Amino acid sequence: MAGLGHPSAFGRATHAVVRAPPESLCRHALRRSQGEEVDFARAERQHELYVGVLGSKLGLQVVQLPADESLPDCVFVEDVAVVCEETALITRPGAPSRRKEVDMMKEALEKLQLNIVEMKDENATLDGGDVLFTGREFFVGLSKRTNQRGAEILADTFKDYAVSTVPVADSLHLKSFCSMAGPNLIAIGSSESAQKALKIMQQMSDHRYDKLTVPDDMAANCIYLNIPSKGHVLLHRTPEEYPESAKVYEKLKDHLLIPVSNSEMEKVDGLLTCCSVFINKKIDS
């Protein structure tokens, strides 16, 4: 089944929901491997700049939720809601320690008058980081955080779109190595597991996507927005953090490119898409 939406509107957004990082992020956020310690002052500054790009530079209405020290991962709002058009699916995160993060997100999205669907099935798990919406269809990564039942509930929620599942073995989430870099353009990392996942997505889809291959999996996570006053906008990792991948993004001449630093969040597996949920509200005439 082909998606019934409008690909030309892909990437449009009027609002962004973000949440401030708590200091507990440094010691208690979930992470796949114990590496460098998070510099909290730097993490706060990077997050402020990220939010500033969305609000001041791009003109989105930013809904800023407060940090909660009892929820170390709460800055990663992407995992707790999937929004498409006027509907928001409040997820059931795969990590039990993150389940209470959904409460404040649900409240914020209710205030924006979205149709709210809650994932109540105790057998289902879904992290938004495993959900790639292309404008035509959904791909859902089956990972340690997201299961088949979670994918089924997403498919039931967004019935106008095809939903295909992709096994994710070596990464935290599907979007740990891919994202949309444009209306028909998938940014994908170069690792064997990333390329294997791309091949599965290509086989599952009726549509042929263009691909943008970057050397670094983490740098394949970028944010594409279609802002009427700015055109095609792409937030991507900085040349200082990922020099070779940044060179690939710089070839996208029809995009307004905005390099964004994310070194501290990455230490606890957070990437650019993790820290925002975008909503496109219809303007009442």
Curated annotation (Swiss-Prot):
A GO BP entry: arginine catabolic process
Binding-site positions, Zn(2+): 274
Keyword Transport: no
GO CC list: mitochondrion
Amino acids binding substrate: 30, 73, 78-79, 98, 145, 268
Keywords, alphabetical: Acetylation, Hydrolase, Metal-binding, Phosphoprotein, S-nitrosylation, Zinc
GO molecular function, one term: dimethylargininase activity
Top-level division of the source organism's lineage: Eukaryota
Null mutant phenotype: Mutants from some strains grow and develop normally. Mutant tissues do not show any dimethylarginine dimethylaminohydrolase activity. They have higher than normal tissue levels and plasma levels of asymmetric dimethylarginine (ADMA) and N(G)-monomethyl-L-arginine (MMA). They also have decreased nitric oxide porduction and increased blood pressure. They do not show differences in the structure of the kidney, lung or heart. Death at embryonic stages have been shown in other strains.
Modification N-acetylalanine, positions: 2
EC number: 3.5.3.18
Modified sites of kind Phosphoserine: 33
Tissue occurrence: Detected in skeletal muscle, lung, heart, liver, kidney and brain (at protein level).
Reactions this protein catalyses: N(omega),N(omega)-dimethyl-L-arginine + H2O = dimethylamine + L-citrulline; N(omega)-methyl-L-arginine + H2O = L-citrulline + methylamine
Enzyme class of the recorded protein, top EC level: hydrolase
InterPro entries: DDAH-like
Residues the record marks as active site: 173, 274
A Pfam entry, by short name: DDAH_eukar
Activity regulation behaviour: Inhibited by zinc ions.
Subunit record text: Monomer.
Family according to the record: Belongs to the DDAH family.
Role description: Hydrolyzes N(G),N(G)-dimethyl-L-arginine (ADMA) and N(G)-monomethyl-L-arginine (MMA) which act as inhibitors of NOS. Has therefore a role in the regulation of nitric oxide generation.
Name of the featured protein: N(G),N(G)-dimethylarginine dimethylaminohydrolase 1
Organism of origin: Mus musculus
Gene: Ddah1
